[in-house]
Amino acid sequence: MNELIREIGKSKGYDDKLCNTLEKIIPAMIMHYGEEYRDLILKVLEETTITICKSNENVYEVLNKLETIEEDESIVGIQDVKIAAGVSSTIPRISCKDGEFSIDKLERHIVLAFGDIESKAQIRTLVHEFSHALKSYENSHYIKGDIYYSRSGFIEIFERLSLDENGKVVRTLISEKNVGMEEGFNSLDDSIITSIITGEDRKFESYRGPAVIAEEADCLLGYRNERIKAQLTGDIDTYKNIYNGSSSEDLFGEQSKNLDEVVKEEYRLFRNILLYGSDKEEDKKLLEEIQNERAKLVHVCRNNIDKAIESKVNVK
């Protein structure tokens, strides 16, 4: 397999260090996600371009050259992208002919911040972003009328398509959901895969609140294979139904909203990460406020899992 991975890497112009890293990551991903997804993982490797920023660049600058990034109401804002360690993005090239929109092609990119790709931190980031790319491949993009749908794992985004005065296709956000849930499960997955690669105990390096809830959902509910299938194939409804069990409530939808609130606090914490160690009282208070809010929201999420466990027990 290493020969195939290196062959794909060299065909895309990757250097030896990146190829060496991919030779560690790809087998570990197959081990974690399952042999049945081997071909899908290799296909994503072949069709995704990995770019590492230069020392004077950030992820936002590189990504913005590929696709103009507009500020909207997304949970992840431009400022979050500017300080991100990495981003996975599927860029649709959409055209309009005779009033009908269509996807001409999809360009798949992973952009990593400047750093040593063989370092543990960069390996974990690449695992995280490659997992996002993997979960946004199958059944993930379509156009219906003037509505563009895109999916990355559990994340579902609906955008309205229109033309500007120059005839350029414009996408306007309508709705976005399940961001916190997806980041939690993806962080759980990247911690396991990174542990397989390094042989060290796994730990959550990012999205800790959502990741803790994701781990508890997998362990306590026992639907790990079903949730991985939902993320990789887009069969979200099946996972949603088994999560809800016999409950008359939409526990999945409720948990999704809870986790979106948790992830907002995660981003808020990350934006203020440089305040750690500050002697200023207002800085200490701000960090304490964010951490307390995150802790409250995590408690709400745990109550939701308790309900899901109860509904599972009551399934006839």
PLM feature spans:
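Charged, low-complexity interaction regions
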Residues: 13, 35-39, 201, 280-283
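Fold-level signature of zinc-dependent metallopeptidase catalytic domains
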Residues: 1-19
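Active-site scaffold of zinc-dependent metalloenzymes
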Residues: 49, 59-160, 167
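Non-Sec secretion/translocation targeting segments of pathogen effectors
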Residues: 1-3, 186, 311-316
